[in-house]
């Protein structure tokens, strides 16, 4: 069975069976996706995280189908209806829909009209009608009038119920109807009378009809949400007459009285059984496709957000701005530890701008502040302006930082554990400052669904969503790597091979014994076994370690290779890392072995070139247009700087410094055809846009990147 799975997955993904087998073997052995992708390239043929995840997903689906087959076979055997031909059909079928069609006639049912008719002894009459040879079925039906069967008409009705069920369970009929649905089904939405005002935000769908196959995921999810809120009536429709006609061509063989009885049964089968069944099936399938697309978009947005450029280890002031309640100010050291907090009131109604400046000046001097992070919520622009009007004694850079999810973090157990003696306002300001220093380390503390980059995230399959987002966070954390001596337990949790318990054990060990001096010391951590060490070691960094390789992505299992390279060149490992000319003399082919191939050697050489390199780019200072404060300040044709805040499959939302974000539709991202917005823009990218239209009533702003100067 395993080999069959390998062949099927290989055919679906276009990856060799050997790669599939090796990858699944590693996964079964407990290896994580980041570990396999980074350190087992020879075994997988260089597959990336997405390919490995896809292999795992397909394998799990096939195992589920195999388990379902076992249940189906057991049920049919219990009924004594299994035949060699039926067994072969089940064995050969791996499509879940086709499998359920095979099983349908044997599936135990609640008491249906057909089952009730069978219990009245009407199945022989149904068989007689289906033969369509009897010229006077009413006369033959009279023989079945007994017990609960009142008269011949009642007998014929029961027989038609049996035929209707047989028609609805016929594989050919179901497939015909599926094909018709796939080609012709229309998704129709209409506003429920009296709900026009309440459902104003769904105005685009008040009277819409479009082919289901062309309905984009975001439109489908929006329509389904409006339906769930009781604002729209939604249906899937198609040409009923054509469908019934095609069914009659299949089942009605004679133009006689029996044929008319069968035709009546076919019409009933379509209306009462087949159409609702296939409609439900298509609704579920289209919802699943929309969910998968929305989850894919969310995961990609999250990946980009987590990999946003960090300011790094600098002394930062964080400001959570506000008007009446003032601005909460915190000062952090280069490691993100809280040194000081207080409030300032530079804005109305208090207007203590002079006092606010004096306090800021004092804090900047006292804590040697190098940068200021301002939250992008209420009073953000006013606070930014206030800061830029001041002349401080030290040079400080000012950054606007997304507050999305900061309030969730500030009230969370993680925040309470970190700052038990401070209130939520202090914790929120600390989170804003830390997001500037290292977005990844801070954002992993927040449920990704609270970060605000999802598309209809509450409407999609929550189990699938969580699995995808957790894997995305894990991939990002391991791509960057973490400092073993400063990482929080929450960040360590996402490191390959660790999890919550080992992560906490590492933090506890650090607290009791001081900083780790080497990766080897990890083996002293309670419950750290050889397997966990193998999986995690390469992703944990120790700056200033005795062995410089402990601060690189070179895995300890490969240290001997680097040591041999250094020995062959007559130098130390540290000298090899420091001297470009020495590295140029390395001949990688000399270090090939049955277990170490060129992919691993190339990775090692890249690490020696830039030890512990951070894949995230340098951070850039950004300024919004000073003349734009509200949506009323916008004019068509106006060009503005902006920051991409969210990406969907229909375009990108851009923060232009006001309360409302503007949308760059897919068609307005570039002169060329764009199928995926991520080809053009990414989360946090700084862009220049032009205003196309402004709808102040609905708070909608349309933007373009086409024909923009500079």
Specify the residue positions occupied by each region the protein language model found.
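Duplex nucleic acid-engaging cores and interfaces of nucleic-acid transaction enzymes
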Residues: 51-54, 61, 65-318, 324-422, ...
């Amino acid at each position: 069975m395993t080999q069959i799975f390998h062949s099927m997955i290989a055919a679906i993904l276009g990856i060799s069976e050997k790669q599939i087998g090796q990858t699944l073997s590693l996964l079964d052995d407990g290896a994580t996706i980041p570990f396999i992708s980074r350190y087992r390239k020879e075994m997988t043929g260089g597959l990336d995280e997405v390919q490995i995840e896809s292999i795992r997903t397909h394998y799990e689906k096939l195992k589920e189908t195999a388990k379902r087959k076992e249940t189906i076979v057991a049920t049919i055997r219990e009924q004594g209806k299994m035949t060699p031909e039926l067994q072969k059909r089940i064995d050969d079928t791996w499509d879940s829909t086709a499998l359920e069609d095979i099983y349908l006639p044997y599936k135990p049912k609640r008491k249906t009209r057909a089952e009730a008719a069978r219990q009245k002894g009407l199945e022989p009459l149904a068989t007689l009608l289906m033969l369509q040879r009897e010229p006077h079925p009413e006369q033959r039906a009279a023989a079945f009038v007994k017990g609960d069967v009142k008269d011949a008409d009642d007998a014929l009705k029961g027989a038609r119920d049996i035929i209707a069920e047989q028609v609805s369970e016929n594989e050919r009929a179901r497939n015909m109807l599926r094909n018709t649905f796939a080609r012709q089904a229309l998704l129709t939405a209409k506003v429920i009378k009296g709900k026009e005002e309440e459902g104003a935000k769904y105005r685009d769908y008040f009277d819409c009809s479009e082919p289901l196959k062309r309905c984009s995921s975001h439109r489908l999810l929006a329509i389904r949400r409006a339906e769930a809120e009781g604002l729209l009536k939604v249906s899937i429709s198609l040409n009923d007459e054509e469908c019934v006609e095609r069914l009659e061509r299949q089942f009605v063989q004679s133009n006689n009285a029996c044929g008319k009885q069968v035709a009546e049964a076919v019409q009933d089968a379509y209306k009462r059984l087949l159409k609702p069944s296939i409609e439900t099936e298509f609704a579920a399938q289209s919802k699943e496709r929309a969910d998968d697309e929305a989850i894919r978009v969310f995961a990609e947005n999250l990946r980009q957000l987590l990999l946003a450029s960090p300011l790094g280890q600098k002394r930062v002031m964080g400001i959570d701005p506000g008007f009446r309640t003032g601005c909460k100010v915190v000062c952090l050291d280069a490691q993100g530890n809280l040194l000081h907090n207080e409030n300032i009131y530079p804005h109305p109604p208090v207007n203590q701008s002079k006092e606010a400046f004096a306090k800021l000046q004092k804090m900047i001097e006292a804590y040697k502040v190098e940068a200021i992070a301002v939250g992008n919520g209420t009073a953000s622009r006013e606070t930014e302006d206030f800061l830029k009007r001041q002349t401080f004694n030290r040079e400080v850079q000012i950054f606007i930082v997304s507050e999305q999810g900061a309030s969730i973090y500030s009230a969370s157990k993680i925040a309470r554990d970190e700052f038990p003696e401070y209130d939520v306002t202090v914790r929120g300001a600390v989170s804003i400052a830390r997001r500037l220093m290292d977005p990844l380390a801070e954002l992993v503390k927040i449920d990704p669904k609270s970060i605000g980059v999802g598309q209809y995230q509450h409407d999609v399959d929550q189990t699938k969503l969580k699995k995808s987002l957790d894997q995305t966070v894990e991939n990002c954390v391991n791509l960057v790597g973490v400092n073993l001596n400063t990482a929080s337990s929450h960040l360590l949790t996402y490191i390959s091979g660790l999890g919550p318990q080992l992560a906490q054990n590492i933090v506890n060990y650090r607290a009791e014994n001081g900083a780790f001096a080497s990766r080897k010391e990890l083996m002293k951590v309670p419950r750290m076994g050889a397997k966990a060490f193998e999986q995690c070691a390469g992703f944990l960094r120790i700056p200033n370690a005795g062995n410089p390789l402990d601060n690189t992505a070179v895995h300890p299992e490969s240290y001997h290779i680097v040591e041999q390279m250094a020995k062959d060149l007559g130098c130390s490992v540290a000298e090899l890392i420091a001297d470009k000319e020495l590295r140029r003399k390395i001949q990688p082919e000399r270090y090939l072995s049955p277990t170490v191939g060129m992919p691993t050697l190339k990775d090692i050489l890249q690490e020696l070139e830039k030890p512990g390199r951070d894949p995230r780019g340098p951070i850039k200072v950004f300024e919004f247009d000073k003349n734009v404060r509200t949506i009323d300040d916008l004019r068509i044709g106006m060009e503005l700087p902006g920051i991409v805040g969210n990406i969907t499959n229909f375009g990108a939302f851009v923060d232009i410094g006001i309360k409302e974000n503007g949308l760059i539709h897919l068609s307005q991202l570039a002169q060329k055809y764009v199928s995926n917005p991520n080809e053009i823009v990414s989360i946090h990218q700084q862009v220049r846009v032009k205003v196309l239209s402004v709808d102040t009533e609905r708070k909608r702003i349309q933007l373009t990147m086409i024909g923009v100067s500079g």
